[in-house]
Curated annotation (Swiss-Prot):
Enzyme's top EC category: isomerase
Catalytic activity: (2S,6S)-2,6-diaminopimelate = meso-2,6-diaminopimelate
SUPFAM superfamilies, sorted: Diaminopimelate epimerase-like
Alphabetical list of Pfam families matching this protein: DAP_epimerase (PF01678)
Source species: Synechocystis sp. (strain ATCC 27184 / PCC 6803 / Kazusa)
Protein biosynthesis among keywords: no
Protein name, UniProt field: Diaminopimelate epimerase
EC number per UniProt: 5.1.1.7
Keyword Electron transport: no
Family that this chain belongs to: Belongs to the diaminopimelate epimerase family.
Highest taxon of the lineage: Bacteria
Length: 279
């Protein structure tokens, strides 16, 4: 069959967007999505995002298959791309959507300057909600030791609807993420695997981060990871509640509100091209 698609990216974190509004189930299997994400034999992407009908009073539902065929709960850069995709389909420039995801209802807002601001919800900090066994149920994981690749890392864990393990380092550019990333992702302390963020503090309001994403590997940006980065910086006394997070693909503005405990992410989403692919 011929699949119509559009390609979008958020700071280089790129996705295949599919208009799936006529069905409540994705029109592709995880295996087909994995084939399309292949950068040599397919379209090439970090994941496939499906725009499905809304549930429970929401405007739309988002489902995602990663480049390895796995399905994450949510994706911060992905939901910005989805919001831009929906706005392009509807022919509007400024709009707020309520999107049902496996991590709950997320609210992206298209701004007049072309940026997308997203209410990412509240972070979950208790060990069983990450989930991880690094601390007993009911306790937080903040700067606790984790042995990986022959050394001990001080890690903080945050769930943004998906699991994040975060560690602060002196120089993020010196790390071999291809080598150590999978060891964090598949560490037995994380029953559902984990995303891993390596963070360098540039200032109290500026953080530099590289990410190894669960199911996707090294990516140029991670929205939920940027949110978790600011949470970890605040919890460990390394950063402010409002920070610029520098990623290989560009910057995200993150605020962890003291008023409502919610995280707000602002960043770009851009259409690259549209086409058809044979499945």
């Amino acid at each position: 069959m011929a699949l119509s698609f559009s390609k979008y990216h958020g700071l280089g974190n790129d996705f295949i967007l599919v208009d799936n509004r006529q069905s409540t189930e994705p029109c592709l299997t995880p295996d087909q999505a994995q084939q399309l994400c292949d950068r040599h034999f397919g379209i090439g992407a970090d994941g496939v995002i499906f725009a499905l009908p809304g549930q429970g009073g929401t405007d739309y539902t988002m489902r995602i298959f990663n480049s390895d065929g796995s399905e994450p709960e949510m994706c911060g850069n992905g939901i910005r791309c989805l919001a831009k995709f929906l706005a392009d389909l509807e022919g509007v420039e400024e709009k707020t959507y309520r999107i049902h995801t496996l991590a709950g209802v997320i609210t992206p807002q298209l701004l007049a300057d072309g940026q997308v601001k997203v209410d990412m919800g509240e972070p979950q900090l208790l060990a069983e909600l990450i989930p991880t066994t690094l601390a007993p149920a009911g306790e937080k994981v903040v700067d606790l030791p984790l042995a990986v690749a022959g050394q001990t890392w001080a890690v903080t864990c945050v769930s943004m609807g998906n699991p994040h393990c975060l560690t602060f380092v002196d120089d993020v550019d010196s790390l071999n993420l291809t080598e150590i990333g999978p060891l964090f992702e598949h560490h037995p302390q994380f029953s559902q695997r984990t995303n891993t963020e390596f963070i360098q503090v540039l200032g109290s309001d500026r953080l530099k981060m590289r990410v190894w994403e669960r199911g996707a590997g090294i990516t140029l940006a991670c929205g939920t990871g940027a949110c978790a980065t600011v949470v970890a910086a605040v919890l460990t006394g390394r950063g402010d509640r409002r920070c610029t997070v520098e990623l290989p693909g560009g910057n995200l503005e993150i605020e962890w509100s003291a008023q409502d405990n919610r995280l707000y992410m602002t960043g770009p989403a851009q259409r690259v091209f549209s086409g058809q692919a044979e499945i």
